[in-house]
C-alpha cells in the first residue's frame, strides 16, 4: 500500500549555509563596522548578536534575506525575546521548529478525514503517516494539505509504493 509521511523540518544544511552567508555579509557591511554583530548556529537554534535593538533587526533582515535565497521557509523560525547581555550588547534566540506538534497533527488528521478521500492518517511521533490504496489519492491529499494548512510549512517525505 502506498504511503508517505507529513513532517515539519527545515533543511539544516541550507540553514547552515544561509547563516554563513549572513555572517560574511555582516562582516563586510559598512553599517556593521566596529560592532560585534553576528549569527551563531547550534543544533536547532540560531542566536543573533548585536550592539543595540536596531542592529539586531538589521542582522535579522540579512538572515531572512539569505534564508529566502536558499529556499528555506521562514515560518520554521520561532523568535524568542531580545535579551541584554553585558554592557550595551543584545542577543536574540531564534528556535528552529522541528516535528509536527500534537495539535497540528490532530488538525491534519481531521482535515484528511473530512476530505472523504479514501486514505488513512495516523499520528506517529512527530510525523503523520498517510496510507492509501492508490497513488492518485495520496497526491490529492498532498495538494489538499498544501492548500488547507498554510500557517505551517509542511514537507512530505518517505513516499513508498
From Swiss-Prot:
InterPro entries noted in UniProt: DUF520, UPF0234-like_C, UPF0234_N, YajQ-like_sf
UniProt KW Metal-binding keyword: no
Domain of life of the native organism: Bacteria
Disulphide linkage map: none
GO cellular component terms listed in the entry, alphabetical order: cytosol
Gene Ontology terms for molecular function: nucleotide binding
Keywords: Nucleotide-binding
One Pfam family linked to the record: DUF520
Function: Nucleotide-binding protein.
Entry's family note: Belongs to the YajQ family.
Protein name as annotated: Nucleotide-binding protein Rpic_2826
Lineage, opening ranks: Bacteria, Pseudomonadati, Pseudomonadota, Betaproteobacteria, Burkholderiales
